[in-house]
């Protein structure tokens, strides 16, 4: 079969029309060095600071050092199989994590991927881990309480919604226990919680998750885990990921609580990354921007006003303020709060709860040192009944410590001094509390009323906690309406005081403890 020139021309034209080629332009680079989770890349000319770089094997690195002829990036995950000459490419994206209600009750890693074996997460969307904190005009003053359930904290060092309250102390003195109890106590309050574990043992994280589940608190909690076996990059970024997940609720007019456990280990991970990137070391070998590392994170915890929420949700949510309350944890070495990272975080936060090993070992748990613990803004947020009845607690403890030191040298004491000492001993004993047993507002109010009005006089020290437990049981069964009123309103007036006085007088007469 012979084709004439016209047919050949038509055939060629048809083939040309059907020809389809897709071209893709991408910015590609080559790994020139791999060192302990840090890679140096040549050829990525227009990469952004903090941009995700795609590596072989569906992994990513984050660009941290942008130099004249190379890029220093930190690998998110395993890096042992990366080698010199491997091709990488820029993505044009900043690191984002999933957010939304679907994350509640789940355990995720720094990237928001589930690690609890409960299947995929249907997230509401993705948001960047690094965000700018709300401005001055967008904020509102702190005036609503976050009840931790601890008598010593809620009475003396109250925490408000949108506050940053540091929990600081040596290892093994109850820092995590206090934070976990605060999360457990938010059950039924509508406050969503985020627990960020940085550099913890995997067994410790598993134990926390188990305890939250046992006490019905996992349903309102997101656990972000970057255990000690994870890379330094994942440990450094975990608090920012958790913060973004918490901000989702804040920006939609809800209240959230986030625990960073702990920021000392995050600073160590960041120091490791910085030294490997050959950034100049400063005090204690930390890089120069370690203050900014924590300040830009903790400034994102805030109470935002109605206008901010309305603008953020495009008018969907009106008349609601949102808040993100932060409880950062810092571990000190031998009680040294003047080290670099502790002083940084103390200066950033709105107060600190200082836990002491000596008090912990003496059986005073929670081991709160009332003398140097402070809440700078929480007083305005305190519940009325606890503010009114708890006011004398700090003073009683301060006087007791002063007199206890003096009485070691004085042989005989006058009656007034002895009475103050005994009152201080009773207050110290009453402030003790078991783990995983946070108190309601009414139960706490009853305990504070008992010590304030002298109902603990004449009770042996070793019987005070038994007296308190029996009193709570009696009040919740015999005076349920009064307890319900106090729990719902948090008010304290002459009528409530009179009813409490009658109830405690009757209870003390029964001698049932």
UniProtKB/Swiss-Prot annotation:
Keyword Nucleotide-binding attached: yes
Gene Ontology cellular component annotations, sorted alphabetically: plasma membrane; proton-transporting ATP synthase complex
Database matches in PROSITE patterns: ATPASE_ALPHA_BETA (PS00152)
Catalytic activity: ATP + H2O + 4 H(+)(in) = ADP + phosphate + 5 H(+)(out)
Entry keyword annotation includes Iron-sulfur: no
Keywords: ATP synthesis, ATP-binding, Cell inner membrane, Cell membrane, CF(1), Hydrogen ion transport, Ion transport, Membrane, Nucleotide-binding, Translocase, Transport
Quaternary state and interactors: F-type ATPases have 2 components, CF(1) - the catalytic core - and CF(0) - the membrane proton channel. CF(1) has five subunits: alpha(3), beta(3), gamma(1), delta(1), epsilon(1). CF(0) has three main subunits: a(1), b(2) and c(9-12). The alpha and beta chains form an alternating ring which encloses part of the gamma chain. CF(1) is attached to CF(0) by a central stalk formed by the gamma and epsilon chains, while a peripheral stalk is formed by the delta and b chains.
Name under which the protein is recorded: ATP synthase subunit alpha
Organism: Alteromonas mediterranea (strain DSM 17117 / CIP 110805 / LMG 28347 / Deep ecotype)
Taxonomic lineage from the root: Bacteria, Pseudomonadati, Pseudomonadota, Gammaproteobacteria, Alteromonadales
Name of the encoding gene: atpA
């Amino acid at each position: 079969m012979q084709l004439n020139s016209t047919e050949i021309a038509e055939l060629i034209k048809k083939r040309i029309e059907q020809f389809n080629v897709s071209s893709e332009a991408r910015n590609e680079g080559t790994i020139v060095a791999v060192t302990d989770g840090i890679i140096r890349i040549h050829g990525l000319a227009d990469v952004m600071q903090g941009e995700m770089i795609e590596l072989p094997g569906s992994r990513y690195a984050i660009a941290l050092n942008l130099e004249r002829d190379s890029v220093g990036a930190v690998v998110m995950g395993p890096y042992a199989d990366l080698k010199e000459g491997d091709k990488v490419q820029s993505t044009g994206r900043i690191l984002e994590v999933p957010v939304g209600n679907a994350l509640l009750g789940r355990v995720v890693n720094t990237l928001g991927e589930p690690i609890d074996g409960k299947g995929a997460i249907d997230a509401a969307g993705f948001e960047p881990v690094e965000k700018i904190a709300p401005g001055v005009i967008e904020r509102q003053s702190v005036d609503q309480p976050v009840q931790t359930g601890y008598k010593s904290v809620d009475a003396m060092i109250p925490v408000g919604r949108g506050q940053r309250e540091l929990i600081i102390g040596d290892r093994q003195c109850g820092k995590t226990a206090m934070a976990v109890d605060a999360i457990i106590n938010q059950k039924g309050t509508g406050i969503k919680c985020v627990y960020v574990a940085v550099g913890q043992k995997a067994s410790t994280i598993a134990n926390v998750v188990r305890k939250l589940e046992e006490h019905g608190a996992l349903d309102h909690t997101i656990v972000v885990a970057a255990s000690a076996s994870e890379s330094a990059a994942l440990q450094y970024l975990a608090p920012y990921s958790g913060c973004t997940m918490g901000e989702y609720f804040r920006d939609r007019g809800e209240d959230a609580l986030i625990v960073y456990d702990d920021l000392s280990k995050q600073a160590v991970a960041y120091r490791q990354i910085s030294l490997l990137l050959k950034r100049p070391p400063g005090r204690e070998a930390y890089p120069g921007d370690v203050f900014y590392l924590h300040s830009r994170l903790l400034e994102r915890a805030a109470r935002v006003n109605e206008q901010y929420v309305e603008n953020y949700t495009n008018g969907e949510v009106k008349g609601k303020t949102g808040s993100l309350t932060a409880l950062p944890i810092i571990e000190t070495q031998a009680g040294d709060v003047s080290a670099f990272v502790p002083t940084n975080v103390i200066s950033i936060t709105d107060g600190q709860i200082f836990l002491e090993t000596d008090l912990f070992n003496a059986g005073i748990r929670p081991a709160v040192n009332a003398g140097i613990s402070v809440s700078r803004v929480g007083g305005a947020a305190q519940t009325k009944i606890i503010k009114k009845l708890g006011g004398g607690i700090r003073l009683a403890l301060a006087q007791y410590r002063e007199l206890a030191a003096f009485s070691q040298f004085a042989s005989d004491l006058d009656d007034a001094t002895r009475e103050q000492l005994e009152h201080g001993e009773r207050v110290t004993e009453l402030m003790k509390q078991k783990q995983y047993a946070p108190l309601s507002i009414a139960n706490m109010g009853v305990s504070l009323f008992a010590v304030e009005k002298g109902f603990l006089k004449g009770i042996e020290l070793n019987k005070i906690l038994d007296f308190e437990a029996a009193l709570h049981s009696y009040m919740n069964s015999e005076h349920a309406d009064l307890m319900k009123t106090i729990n719902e309103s948090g008010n304290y007036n002459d009528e409530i005081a009179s009813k409490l006085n009658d109830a405690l007088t009757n209870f003390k007469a029964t001698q049932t403890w």
